[in-house]
Amino acid sequence: MHRTVLALSFMLLAGGLMLVAQTPSTDAPPQVHADMNQLMRGVLYPAANVVFSAQGDNPGDVKFVPGHDPNMSTDPLTSTFGGWQAVENAALALAESANLLSIAGRNCSNGVPAPTKDPAWTVFVQEVRDASMKSYRAAQAKDQDKMIETAETLSAACAGCHRKFRDRKAPENRCKVQ
């Protein structure tokens, strides 16, 4: 009996150690898979366009196209999760993307490291995050007037960062701290 308990204890301990060995470390730095240009074009730009579209078109008025499967729609507003929900989702994607903008190790398209440690970068990223969450709350409330205001705030946050870090005469100077 004693041997059985000892053997079972050993098996449980070994199994627990195997689980611990397979658990990803929380100390591992986030992996970067896209440069800044790819991140902007792939995530932030499309999501921002959904938020910006709510300035002129009420997402609640968007109609599904008869005969077209909303599961296959490439237009977020007419997809399965369309209308105001698409605007909510886009705003949340932008807010979460602010975290991606802060990850060290990401380069700009010209190979220059993104200036994640620059104080101005941190401010701009926080402005994007804040404006995105305001857009999310406006979309939840289905308040188009508030969407106009929050989209303008989001646009200003994006433009401020672009003026400082992107809009340079020579593309090789993008992301360089001046």
Where are each of the predicted segments found?
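Bacterial N-terminal signal peptides
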Residues: A7-M18
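Mature extracytoplasmic or organellar-lumen-exposed domains after removal of signal/transit peptides
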Residues: T23-Q178
